[in-house]
């Protein structure tokens, strides 16, 4: 089974729950147009596998991921430099998103430290869009182009 995009979310402002959309436009050298992280060079896009959300009883966007995929549970463990193609867009993995207590606060967790520990190794991959930009849509296939 191929991995596929199952949810897309835009963070239009910090501190506000992201808005679900069916299509986004990825911008070379950064992230997703209309997202508050678009100009970041190393932490522009968070890609997360649905299995993490399901294991923790969370909904799409709760971990502030822009792209939720299904079928690649190892996405959090992809080495920096790994290249992904989502639809026609290419992204470079810059590393794992380190769990913090802030995400627990955003999700009203009663024990933010326990929530942080539960996310260890499952928080997703932080990425940057490389030279190939364009649209990403719910349903797009996700492939690993180059493993680092």
Q: Model-derived features: where do they sit?
A:
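Metal-cofactor-dependent catalytic cores
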Residues: 1-148
């Amino acid at each position: 089974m191929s991995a596929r995009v199952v949810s897309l979310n835009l963070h239009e402002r910090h501190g506000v729950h992201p808005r679900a959309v069916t299509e986004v436009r990825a911008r070379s050298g950064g992230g997703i147009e209309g997202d508050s992280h678009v100009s970041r060079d190393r932490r522009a896009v968070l890609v997360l596998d649905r299995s993490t959300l399901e294991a923790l009883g969370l909904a799409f966007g709760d971990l502030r991921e822009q792209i939720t995929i299904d079928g690649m549970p190892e996405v959090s463990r992809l080495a920096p430099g790994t290249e992904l193609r989502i639809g026609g867009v290419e992204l470079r993995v810059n590393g794992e998103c380190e769990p913090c207590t802030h995400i627990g606060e955003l999700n009203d967790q009663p024990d933010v430290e326990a929530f942080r520990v539960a996310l260890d190794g499952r928080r997703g991959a932080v990425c940057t869009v490389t030279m190939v930009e364009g649209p990403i849509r719910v349903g797009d296939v996700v492939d690993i182009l180059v493993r680092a």
